[in-house]
């Protein structure tokens, strides 16, 4: 047993104080007791910290562009500030914005170029006007999605800019601008956002530099962007060249192929990122950049065994998180590429999938590599993880990716890659890549000598894997701890004979729920708010049109109405037009829908079966059968909701609505168009389409 003096020395050492040479037993007791209390407190705090580390926190998904926190960056004397804004859904608009920035910097020494995510431009709506007044030359890269809506990171700016125009009047006389829109001509509201912003800028006093560019992703949006860029240079020469060299011809510009610096790490020092673990980041809300990893609680097949297709019902468990949602919202899901795709890509790259590495935007000496694109993942991880979670491997590659591949091809025959990426190879690219739906992996397999280093592959060839969005098929009143998803499996042959498997739907098809195994599947998710909402007044009639998985948000609506009715709320009439092929194969949620009718939350269920009778019957045919009743409900102030395929079903339903208005109101086509337009403007004709 230690002597008192030894114990005193130990206590002194622990407390970091001197107790003197003569210490009484009572003082020693106090000191040792204090030490014990301190030790106990430290152990308690460590344990609490350890427990807290298990709490659900956001997964950090790095942003392509990190905006400076400080205010306006000073522009050097003699320089002209050029700001390029982007609003992107899949990263294409952002890529175009950065490509434009690099070319402007290369062509014009006096240009001080900055690329800005519209969502980061102003922390508060009140700052938009103040900041825009300081701009002189701007460009907007704006994508349109769904039913002519702005994408997430441009929605706040778009709402502010278009809704407050009357108050501001003409105030942008000092601003010169250009707009390039990204859309798909197959959709009804082709490039609506780009067109509207272009028109509004002019109406609010700004000077249009060139005509709005209309990128069509149904063809070659890269060619559209290149053509629009070419129209810029003669105009920018007047603004960004000095008088003495205004007439000189610019040196032909060749875009540099971006590349990250790769650092190899010891695989035994596995990073937490390799497990895609949750990481604290200070955010109190989850969003596209800070999703939350949650478990799959339930997964089941909705089609009957007789069906040759598949539709999955999946439930994410959000208990213990701060995730909340409203009926009608969307959920974004970060899924993973399947093992088969990852293995094949690893072989094509000639790399070990267990390679543990990180990507960096600076050189060994700390200087910048020149690009502004941050790595697609935030820390060291294995190549297997990087390919599974962060690389888009199954979409057709862009032309810029083919050019990057070509620079690392060793076989003369692989020179074809350069041709495909060139203006001369436009038709061949459209046919061989886009028309044949060749994925990046397929293209790499066709040109096996092209083995780019990982720094080039992740910077210039494989885009970041984007989240997939689904209409939530539940109501928080009915399922507050769950987010339900209804997902059709994407599976089928491409023109090349390859079987295309949708990334997220395949993941959901193979997901293991917690009700079947503790080792269940999980995914990072976030909620995207939607304006697809039930009327605030629950007595207002509603008409819902949603064949197939278009039923998803209406299942949430009906759960909501079920809960409201159980609480004694008086409900207005509700009609649901649903469509499927055959009641014996793909009549999803059949029992639930019938129970909603029995309980009274659904007034009438009208189903169109397209493969049962001699003639195909679709929801629009059933709408015409019920034209008088349908229009009567709308005339009483009712709401019409449509969900599903934008290119086919939603367009047909829209035309049917026009026909119903003409017939029931006895008006011509122009007047019917005006009536339908007013329904949309009043928020009584809502569409959730893709």
Curated annotation (Swiss-Prot):
Q: Which reaction does it catalyse?
A: 2 oxidized [cytochrome P450] + NADPH = 2 reduced [cytochrome P450] + NADP(+) + H(+)
> What are the binding positions for NADP(+) in this chain?
309, 549, 610-611, 616-620, 652
Q: Which residues does the record give as FMN binding sites?
A: 88-93, 143-146, 182-191, 217
Keyword Mitochondrion assigned: no
Instruction: Please give the residue ranges for the topological domain Lumenal.
Output: 1-25
Keywords from the UniProt entry: Endoplasmic reticulum, FAD, Flavoprotein, FMN, Glycoprotein, Membrane, NADP, Oxidoreductase, Transmembrane, Transmembrane helix
Tell me its EC number(s), please.
1.6.2.4
Task: Please provide one cellular component term from the Gene Ontology annotations of this protein.
Answer: cytosol
Name the record gives this protein: NADPH--cytochrome P450 reductase
């Amino acid at each position: 047993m230690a002597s008192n003096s030894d114990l005193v020395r130990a206590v002194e050492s622990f407390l970091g104080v001197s107790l003197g040479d003569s210490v009484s037993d009572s003082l020693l007791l106090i000191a040792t007791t204090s030490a014990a209390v301190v030790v106990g407190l430290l152990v308690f705090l460590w344990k609490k910290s350890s427990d807290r580390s298990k709490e659900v926190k956001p997964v950090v998904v790095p942003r392509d562009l990190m905006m400076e926190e400080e205010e306006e960056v000073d522009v050097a004397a003699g320089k002209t500030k050029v700001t390029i804004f982007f609003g992107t859904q899949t990263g294409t608009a952002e890529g175009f914005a950065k490509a434009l920035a690099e070319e402007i910097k290369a062509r014009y020494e006096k240009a001080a170029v900055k690329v800005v995510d519209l969502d980061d431009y102003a922390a508060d709506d009140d700052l938009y006007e103040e900041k825009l007044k300081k701009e002189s030359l701007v460009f907007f890269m704006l994508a349109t999605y769904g039913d002519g809506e702005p994408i997430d990171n441009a929605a706040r700016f778009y709402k502010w800019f278009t809704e407050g125009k009357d108050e501001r009047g003409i105030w942008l006389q000092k601003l010169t601008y250009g707009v390039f829109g990204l859309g798909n001509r197959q959709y009804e509201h082709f490039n609506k956002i780009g067109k509207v912003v272009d028109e509004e800028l002019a109406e609010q006093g700004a000077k249009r530099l060139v005509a709005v560019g209309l990128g069509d992703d149904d063809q070659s949006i890269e060619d559209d962007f290149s053509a629009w860029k070419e129209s810029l240079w003669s105009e920018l020469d007047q603004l960004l060249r000095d008088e003495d060299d205004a007439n000189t011809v610019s040196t032909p510009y060749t875009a540099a192929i971006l590349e990250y610096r790769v650092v190899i790490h010891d695989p035994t020092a596995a990073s937490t990122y390799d497990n895609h673990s949750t990481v604290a980041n200070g955010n109190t809300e989850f969003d596209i950049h800070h999703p939350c990893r949650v478990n799959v609680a339930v997964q089941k097949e909705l089609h009957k065994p007789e069906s040759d297709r598949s539709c999955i019902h999946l439930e994410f468990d959000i208990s213990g998180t701060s995730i909340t949602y409203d009926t009608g919202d969307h959920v974004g899901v970060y899924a993973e590429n399947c093992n088969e795709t990852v293995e094949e890509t690893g072989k094509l790259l000639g790399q070990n999938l267990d390679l543990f590495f990180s990507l960096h935007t600076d050189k060994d000496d700390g200087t910048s590599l020149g690009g502004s694109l941050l790595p697609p993942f935030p820390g060291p991880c294995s190549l297997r993880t990087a390919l599974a979670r962060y690389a888009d491997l199954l979409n057709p590659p862009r032309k810029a990716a083919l050019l990057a591949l070509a620079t690392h091809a060793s076989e003369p025959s692989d020179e074809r890659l350069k041709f495909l990426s060139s203006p001369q190879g436009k038709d061949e690219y459209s046919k061989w890549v886009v028309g044949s739906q060749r994925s990046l992996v397929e293209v790499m397999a066709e040109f096996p000598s092209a083995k780019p280093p990982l720094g080039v592959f992740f910077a210039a060839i494989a885009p970041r894997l984007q989240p997939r969005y689904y209409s939530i098929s539940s109501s928080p009143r009915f399922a507050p701890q769950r987010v339900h998803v209804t997902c059709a499996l994407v599976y089928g042959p491409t023109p090349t004979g390859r079987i295309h498997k949708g990334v997220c739907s395949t993941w959901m098809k193979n997901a293991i729920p917690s009700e079947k195994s503790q080792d269940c599947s999980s995914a990072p998710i976030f909620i995207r708010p939607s304006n697809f909402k039930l009327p605030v007044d629950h007595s207002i009639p509603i008409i819902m049109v949603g064949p197939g998985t278009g039923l998803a948000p209406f299942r949430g609506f009906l759960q909501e109405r079920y809960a409201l009715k159980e609480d004694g709320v008086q409900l207005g009439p509700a009609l649901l037009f649903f469509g499927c092929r055959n009641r014996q194969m793909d009549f999803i949620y059949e029992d639930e829908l019938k129970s909603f009718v029995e309980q009274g939350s659904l007034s009438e269920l009208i189903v169109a079966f397209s493969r049962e009778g001699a003639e195909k019957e679709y929801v629009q045919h059933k709408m015409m059968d019920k034209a008088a009743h349908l229009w009567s409900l709308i005339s009483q102030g009712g709401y019409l909701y449509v969900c599903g395929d934008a290119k086919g079903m939603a367009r047909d339903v829209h035309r049917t609505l026009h026909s119903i208005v003409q017939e029931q109101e006895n008006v011509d086509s122009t007047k019917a168009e005006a009536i339908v337009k007013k329904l949309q403007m009043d928020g009584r004709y809502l569409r959730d389409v893709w």
